[in-house]
Amino acid sequence: MAALAEEQTEVAVKLEPEGPPTLLPPQAGDGAGEGSGGTTNNGPNGGGGNVAASSSTGGDGGTPKPTVAVSAAAPAGAAPVPAAAPDAGAPHDRQTLLAVLQFLRQSKLREAEEALRREAGLLEEAVAGSGAPGEVDSAGAEVTSALLSRVTASAPGPAAPDPPGTGASGATVVSGSASGPAAPGKVGSVAVEDQPDVSAVLSAYNQQGDPTMYEEYYSGLKHFIECSLDCHRAELSQLFYPLFVHMYLELVYNQHENEAKSFFEKFHGDQECYYQDDLRVLSSLTKKEHMKGNETMLDFRTSKFVLRISRDSYQLLKRHLQEKQNNQIWNIVQEHLYIDIFDGMPRSKQQIDAMVGSLAGEAKREANKSKVFFGLLKEPEIEVPLDDEDEEGENEEGKPKKKKPKKDSIGSKSKKQDPNAPPQNRIPLPELKDSDKLDKIMNMKETTKRVRLGPDCLPSICFYTFLNAYQGLTAVDVTDDSSLIAGGFADSTVRVWSVTPKKLRSVKQASDLSLIDKESDDVLERIMDEKTASELKILYGHSGPVYGASFSPDRNYLLSSSEDGTVRLWSLQTFTCLVGYKGHNYPVWDTQFSPYGYYFVSGGHDRVARLWATDHYQPLRIFAGHLADVNCTRFHPNSNYVATGSADRTVRLWDVLNGNCVRIFTGHKGPIHSLTFSPNGRFLATGATDGRVLLWDIGHGLMVGELKGHTDTVCSLRFSRDGEILASGSMDNTVRLWDAIKAFEDLETDDFTTATGHINLPENSQELLLGTYMTKSTPVVHLHFTRRNLVLAAGAYSPQ
């Protein structure tokens, strides 16, 4: 944003405060707490226009020690202060005290004035009779001048300041309090915050603005935007929602309850429909006491709302606020918004609507600039013995016929190193065991019989319906070889079924195992206890509903996550719990094994995702950044990244190596409930309660497709084994198949609009829909493609 710095027209003078420095609360979400010691805003002086929080010493963990910058202009409405020297003696002390009291009265700081007057033993009449407002004698002139060098002075000059994050700087607005510049003609106050974090956050709403003017301020801006040109109206309309929320919260915090109620009733209907859930929560905040325990309000306050606006639209807004001298709105723009300015044509209404909707606005362009290794790791070389009958398609059961072994050509499919793949040793992965190699051989054999899907060859769908599931089915998973299916239930149990004729058996007791010949060829069969054989195993251990389940790639283990805040690892050899992983403070909504095993990820109500290893009791990484519950988690095919979907309506991609967030995707209008990566690792599909499926290019961090058709929450997404078909399952009792090849073809990513970080989405989602398959009355909870590209779906029958 260096180019914007050329707009600076005035220079602020920085003075060390004579008293103890005012500690401003760090701006969470913009680098606070990283030990920079400076402000969290971008641009010159630590903030575009607001230089009051510029630090004089660094390294304080993100809490800035501010110097105070004084505007060259006098505060509007204040009388000029003569520079006469004070007289000596006791009269001077009295005059000084009266000058301070007069200053507090002019600033409408009645409580401070009353406390100081009582302490000095002065009568009310003495203060009232010391002179009319603005008439300060020479004895108090120096004191008043000194005070003015410490406090907030807001001077509506010829040019309005730019908001933090834009990098531009106009006329300097000086802020010595957490609330930013005061109203026109007022001198603000210095506020020292020694309160807990919540109080420090809420104190930003402590201002002296006229509550009766809020409706006029908002109506004036609304009228200006609605009367602007069409090309600017869509972009400037993004201001409505964040300004509405912050103005309402200011009124509530300052106990103007009637004005707040009137303001909400008048303007809440003007907000976009996808913000209605947030507005319902906001409407319940009618008193100052309600704000301290409300997470939604704190989220909105501590994270700057991001708006992406073209330079032309921004200049139009800047001129309007300059002419109207609307400092109340400009204060909110400075303190709570991050305006990301780009050069180029303003975006259309359609482009903006496709990207907005999250709790904190759009993602900053810088958030999606990191390099992502989305390629696949090189597969190990394994010789696959193929029979002649297998090649001719005669051996349907895939059993070896003891023919002469041959090398499978498909074994060399991924032998070439992908240029976009991470280094093989970027993160330590478990070594392949002999059983893993055998499983890969079976997988490659199945691949030779895989059906090639497409618009003219759609897959068959096998639906597993859970009947009489009065325990409440909450989670489903299927093993990679499609031999086992697990269900998590609200009665805190996990149930495992065999979907093949082979029954589930436990390992024999230790006393019986000692009698087995370990050198025999069928030792793996002999260790199993036939007396325990059954089609169903029930696992007990959780103390709350089970919300997530995931099989390990080798089918030896099962993970389950629960409302009790734990993730449990179950052995599928003994059907007992091996480990309970404790780290989450609240319910754990989802968990998933890495494609290579060993690692797994979990996400829950505490707004963080955690990376674990099966042999560690504590998490290896904590992925923190979401503003609401982490509803779903998914490993990238190369295991170097983890995707998380949240109730804050964003999707984040995390680097397993260092725990950094490398991608933030916004565009959903409801909480995200499903994620899946394409088999080549380049694309990500996400589904949410808004019924839409969005497609993302991971390498460029851009939305490349939008699939509309579902009328309820999209609970499950899965690509076919070769990536030709995308299947989606929803609470609307349907499975839909989409043409993934057509959705991603002809994407010239090099021609993406770099200025806006967005492309024009093709309006052909119905053309991409290949088929819709309805169930009788069963929401689709889980989808799975077998190794031969047969679709398995699962859900619990719920009669209307």
Curated annotation (Swiss-Prot):
Belongs to the WD repeat TAF5 family. One of its GO terms (biological process) is positive regulation of DNA-templated transcription. This is Transcription initiation factor TFIID subunit 5. Disulfide bonds: none annotated. Residues 384-395 have a biased composition (Acidic residues). Its main location: nucleus. It is found in: Nucleus. Residues 194-340 are annotated as: NTD2. Homodimer. Component of the TFIID basal transcription factor complex, composed of TATA-box-binding protein TBP, and a number of TBP-associated factors (TAFs), including TAF1, TAF2, TAF3, TAF4, TAF5, TAF6, TAF7, TAF8, TAF9, TAF10, TAF11, TAF12 and TAF13. The TFIID complex structure can be divided into 3 modules TFIID-A, TFIID-B, and TFIID-C. TAF5 forms the TFIID-A module together with TAF3 and TBP, and in TFIID-B with TAF8. Component of the TFTC-HAT complex, at least composed of TAF5L, TAF6L, TADA3L, SUPT3H/SPT3, TAF2, TAF4, TAF5, GCN5L2/GCN5, TAF10 and TRRAP. Residues 165-189 have a biased composition (Low complexity). Residues 1-74, 153-189, 384-438 are annotated as: Disordered. Signal peptide: none annotated. Residues 30-50 have a biased composition (Gly residues). WD repeats lie at residues 468-507, 541-580, 583-624, 625-666, 667-706, 709-748. GO terms for cellular component: actin cytoskeleton; chromatin; nucleoplasm; nucleus; SAGA complex; transcription factor TFIID complex; transcription factor TFTC complex. Distinct domains of TAF5/TAFII100 are required for functional interaction with transcription factor TFIIFB (RAP30) and incorporation into the TFIID complex. Residues 92-124 form the LisH domain. The gene is TAF5.
